[in-house]
Swiss-Prot record:
Intrachain disulfide bonds: none
PROSITE patterns: RIBOSOMAL_S2_1 (PS00962)
Protein origin, superkingdom: Bacteria
GO biological process: translation
UniProt record similarity statement: Belongs to the universal ribosomal protein uS2 family.
NCBIfam families the UniProt entry points to: rpsB_bact
GO CC annotations on file: cytosolic small ribosomal subunit
Pfam families: Ribosomal_S2 (PF00318)
Protein name: Small ribosomal subunit protein uS2
Signal peptide extent: none
């Protein structure tokens, strides 16, 4: 698992919070102080808390669990998509649709529609559709792909959710709480840690910081997968030896 260091966190600007006037008092225990009216996050707390989050992810994935990566703000989108894809995990990078988890049955129907439309589009030319009709089909598929592409291979509800910016993803937290799904989240000084099982106090605006968090969680996923694979191989060898 990637060992993130204090120096790397400083270089990525993890310690820079928001302007002091926007602070959330519930984050007081994670704030070191203020500089130029900007809150400074206490990295001596952030580092071990991030490591705890990584360990929780590794254990969960080693037990065949699924982690849903969520980050729909502009700075997070590409990074969330890249790192979740690298880890082979589902993601939401465009927009959180209300009921994405609490109304998963309906979402599954939309995913089925996406699959059907994609298949129809692949055979559209041979099926005699006009160029205009094919263009409309492409637009439909692109729209559905943007919203659901990251979760189309998700086999049911996730076992945990990794979130960048709890203020931006309030809908995600509400649904996770309703369903009892644990949340691992980056929480900046202007947001509340309520409803988050594994809090990672830190900057949620800098692309460098977001990359550091996502890479670290994706690495933990890959380590968990590797452990699960090794255990499966060991069990198969044991069974063969009997």
């Amino acid at each position: 698992m990637s060992q993130i260091t204090m120096r790397q966190m400083i270089e990525a600007g993890v310690h820079f919070g928001h302007q002091t006037r926007f602070w959330n008092p519930k984050m007081a225990q994670y704030i070191f102080g203020a500089r130029n009216k900007i809150h400074i996050v206490n990295l001596e707390k952030t580092l071990p808390m991030f490591q705890d989050a990584q360990e929780a992810v590794r254990r969960l994935v080693a037990n065949k669990g699924t982690v849903l990566f969520v980050g729909t703000k502009r700075q997070a989108r590409d990074i969330i998509r890249e790192e979740a894809t690298r880890a082979g995990m589902p993601f939401v990078d465009y927009r959180w649709l209300g009921g994405m988890l609490t109304n998963y049955k309906t979402v599954k129907q939309s995913i089925k529609r996406l699959e059907e439309k994609t298949a129809a589009l692949e055979n559209a030319a041979e099926s005699g559709f006009s160029k205009k009709e094919i263009l409309e089909m492409q637009r439909d598929v692109e729209k559905l792909e943007r919203s659901l592409g990251g979760i189309k291979n998700m086999k049911g509800l996730p076992d945990a959710i990794f979130v960048i910016d709890t203020g931006y993803q309030k809908g995600t937290l509400v649904e996770a709480e309703k369903l009892g799904i644990p949340v691992i989240a980056v929480v900046d000084t202007n947001n509340s840690p309520d409803g988050v099982k594994y809090v990672i106090p830190g900057n949620d605006d800098s692309a460098k910081a977001i990359r550091l968090y996502c890479r670290g969680i994706a690495d933990a996923v890959l380590e968990g997968k590797n452990q699960a694979l090794q255990e499966t191989v060991a069990a198969a060898q044991e069974a063969a030896a009997e």
